Amino acid sequence: MKERLRPTTEPSRGGRGKRLRRLVSAILLLGVLAALVRPVRRATRALARRLDARVECFTEPGSSTYARVFAPVFGRLYRGVAEDVASELASRGRKRQPTILDLGCGPGDLVVEISHRLREARIVGIDVSPSMLLWAGRHTTTDGRIRFIVCDAAEVPFDDASVDLVVSTLSMHHWTEPADVFAEIARVLRPDGVALIYDLGLLSSTTSEIASIAEAAGLEPTDIVRERARGGLISRFFVRFTLEGLA
């Protein structure tokens, strides 16, 4: 009988950890030039894919390495995103129990940060990786307020017009067909809903390309922010897209 898959607690090997840190440093360094030089942007994407393959983020032991080593690095960013989510809903006079969907939630850190600020919200995190959601499952609540689902971002098990806010961080550059994901976001959003999509600018397509894809899917890009100062140094490599559902 196969042993049930579970997050490993064994530390990463020293040499492997050093190589991973070098790859991350190289990606961030290239980010300074990526916005200006298109070949550098392509090289950075290739390096990021190499990092994903090296870490094996979507299977064990890579998921455990990500949850224990990489996810905490983005803690300050997640807190800033959670504040954005709360502010966005408050500015729209949202009901007390909004439904929030986190696409590509990984080990669930952002879901937890949002739940601390919106105590009555219903928050669902989805991810294509079962091993990532083994980590996220630690945060599941018995009342169903927080739960996680294994599924593709382009095939979300939600009814039409049932979600108040969609959020995604560090996931868009993994989408093989962004148009399909944006179409799914447009489908599940309520007519007055909003999506906040964050990704590393050096890994994603140009802002104009993404805006065009979103518009074709039935979403209206209302704001594009290249820097998020309150998220710390790392956040300066991010782009945030605010997309609204069409009434």
Task: Describe the predicted segments one by one.
Residues 179-191:
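A short glycine-rich, Lys/Arg-flanked "PGG" loop and its adjoining helix->strand segment in the class I
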Residues 154-165:
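A short acidic, Gly/Pro-enriched loop at the edge of an enzyme's catalytic core
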Residues 165-176:
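A short SAM/SAH-binding and catalytic strip from SAM-dependent methyltransferases
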Residues 101-103, 107-155:
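Class I SAM-dependent methyltransferase SAM/SAH-binding core
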Residues 193-199:
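Conserved beta-strand signature within the Rossmann-like core of class I S-adenosyl-L-methionine
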Residues 41-93, 109, 113:
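Conserved class I S-adenosyl-L-methionine
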Residues 229-247:
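Core SAM-dependent methyltransferase catalytic element
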Residues 1-51:
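Short amphipathic, positively biased membrane-proximal segments
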